[in-house]
Amino acid sequence: MIKRKRSVPEVIPMTLFYMLRVFGSPIIIFIGIIAVWIDSRNTTETMMGIAIIIIGLSPHILAYALARSSRKKIRKILSAIKSSESFLPEPQYEFWEPHSEAYLGIDAKRGNFVYIRLIRRGQVDLIGFDMHNWVGIELDGRLLNIKTKTIEAPVLSMGTRAGDGDRILSLINTMSNRQYRYDCYYFPGYVAHNAKRIAEEYKVFIPVYN
């Protein structure tokens, strides 16, 4: 069974990085601005101030680069799942976690949705749902919890951006009142089948759930 909860050694660097962005970065940038403003005629002092500002901005630049990298990885996985016959959500029904480590795409026309999470390096969750193989969806603040029917992953969580959580719940509730036909294929099985191929192609571990 894959371990989703991050260990203490994994959490500590993330916490320190978050604190640096929230608390350390503004202070460093402020010091740099003061250094430039106090002696703007002194080229050396000005360059030093600019360097300090860049150092202060670097955590945000790194966070942006990591988010872009995560989104790029997820998009590669999605390219193997999306098709006009099985799963093709409209852009407004594709939701990303704030740091792009998780994705939820909802195909309202076909009654399917896909959850992807980059758990850690080399480990990815890729799960397909129709309107029958999940228990419920709840919103706790901005944390969306999908309750599944699998013992290995009873709850799948995803942070949401402002307003997205309510939109997801509203959309799913609307879809629950529709009558979808799944005569041609079993969508969760389709995703699980593709997950094996994706795991081999991208050299990642994707757990398969029954």
Region locations from a protein language model:
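Anionic N-terminal interaction surfaces
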Residues: 45-113
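Short, flexible helical or helix-coil boundary motifs
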Residues: 27, 81-91, 179, 198, ...
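Acidic, Ser/Thr- and proline-rich intrinsically disordered linker/docking segments
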Residues: 2, 135-210
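Alpha-helical transmembrane spans
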Residues: 9-73
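Generic detection of short hydrophobic beta-strand segments and adjacent strand-loop junctions
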Residues: 95-101, 127-129, 153-160
